[in-house]
């Protein structure tokens, strides 16, 4: 059944507030060139995020990285761009959350030769869109210093718009030239509408495939299999957090039904990362796999489509929670 993507009222639940998909975003694809033969970790998102944060601190921190006692914490570029400070937060958010940006890299290659092309994607939301030059400079300096423990050095060739719409195209950066006129900002609501049109034009059972690990609790336990209620509510929470980030104190709606999972194939997955701020190694754990649905309530579909772009669960800033929706018998899209 066709339906438009609209804001969802929660007055029936007694909350009187509205969750909205009117969230600005921009999706950018970075094309880089390796400057020498190099090794990289199989999972690169955590290294990219950590390296970018380190470069931001080196370039901008004026108080010896003592954030807890910093006089300039409200004006801090790193805090605003890297941790995406929110004036108000949902009750379940207790610490700093990196909700304003996502970095994606699903290239599993570990051996790169000089001149090889290395790609990754960055998606910015809300106020983070205005910090593009901060992210760009950090990634540029990361390329000069080297990525990962083997210091893989690279240079940025291009940064391209990579939105779903034909008008979200164009090259923002080529070499040393920034063409900000090609910086094409979209709205999450438009992304949902166009993805829904494509998905509903196909037949077959609905499916969800996690390309990176999902770390999420259901009934106070970390999931070892997929639960439809958890997936839908997880996507709704991410939309809610982005609403708060843009200044809208939205409430999660009450869903009358959830998709029915007909079959699933799940495996456990983990990612090792090094925390420079804590000077320690840690392992992030989750599950990957695919689930096929026997039903797909339309009230849930907008949120699950949004989740494709914004990711769900814990550790999304380290690349977790990326998935694609599909229809069985049709080709899964590349997002």
Residue ranges and their predicted role:
Residues 2-335:
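RNA-interacting cores
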